[in-house]
């Protein structure tokens, strides 16, 4: 965040995973640039495809504790979230890196102050202090975050300050210490 706020920075790219496992991606980018290929990752959906595994999953034990629905529309998911439900979304290829980018995600209403505790209780061994990262549609980002340089964060690897008027609408997706997303 501090680097993005420097006056001399007008654009910034941060790999979707800032750990040792992303060294291989850095090597690929280095060779890509050196060889002038100009091919870049469009997404980080690099893992296995759940749609190829769906018939191999033992659903019975899962269905004892959870309601499992296949082929649910976005409007149904939105309605479930609006009614206070927590959704585990699994679709397509698994994401590489530190963030769930939509294919393996927990979806919930970020304006509910108690939702973080409910999710942490549902996910055993999750530390209570770990923040959740928000997914915000690009067209609505200016309503929630301060980003005067219009920096892109497609892999959710940049932090932004929240706007004071919208903080409580996205409370559960902000860092508890500094209210960033």
Predicted regions and their residues:
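Flexible beta->alpha loop and helix N-cap segments adjacent to enzyme active/binding sites
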Residues: 2-181
